[in-house]
């Protein structure tokens, strides 16, 4: 079974569950038609995700953030242009990310307790969305930071059920499902030197020592955990900002310590970028904006003639992914200190402001 773009063989690129979910693209009679459909649907998914995320951060369908965000991300080379050029699945995954957060926050608003969640359609819908996302790309397990924060056991249970069922269907229906364990898992466990901005990939390119790799890995993991800890109180103050920001830092940290980080993964930061519309957000810090600009504008940098500098600039997105959790952790710590020194500056919980 063949897919178009950069992921040429579904069976060799995904788990049995992911293969089942993506395989309908192979039903198109020609590759050119499949490419066109994937590109148009991918663009529609990205625009739809930005529209919904814009509404979530502003509570207005026609907020200026929507056209500005669409224009900016469709103009810059990374991440949208490459996503569409390669006709990969990442635009659809962005839509699943935003839908999941929207459904989870709607469930939170019901206030029925974790047992009552099992009777809510929002929990089932969120679980199905998460189950599909994790089945296609296991890295989307970071989405579960949201139901963890809001004690949404039902969402996790439904997602697990969907993942198990789709994996079982794939295992018994696709050819040679054992290749997932014999080929794909070993391949993903080893960082590759090309098109890989993860710590492992950068280490191969720059010849870093094992000690350097270990130090950067520990720093990234600690920074990601610190970011989540300092953000935790915002889950009640501003659940939208908390959810999009926590997912972004978990994505950034997770990709850097895993075996693969590609620049167009920054597409899943777009909801975080939109939190600039919230009363308080790490996106209000110029250093955060600079880090994200260096991520998306990297391919535009001209060559300097210095091999070392050019190599570092080429891999700038990887360094920015590594820096993002540390930046957010610092922002969160500063907000804690500020609120303790200026009690009147503390923002009331969103639930109180709406009453």
Predicted regions and their residues:
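Primarily membrane-embedded glycan-assembly and transfer machineries that use lipid-linked glycans
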Residues: 1-2, 6-7, 11-124, 153-270, ...
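Flexible gly/pro-rich beta->alpha loop and the following alpha-helix that scaffold active-site loops
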Residues: 326-329
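Short, well-ordered alpha-helices that flank and scaffold nucleotide-derived cofactor binding pockets
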Residues: 150
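Active-site oxyanion/phosphate-handling segment shared across diverse enzymes
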Residues: 292-295
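Membrane-interface alpha helices of multi-pass inner-membrane proteins
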Residues: 122-138, 142-147, 249-256
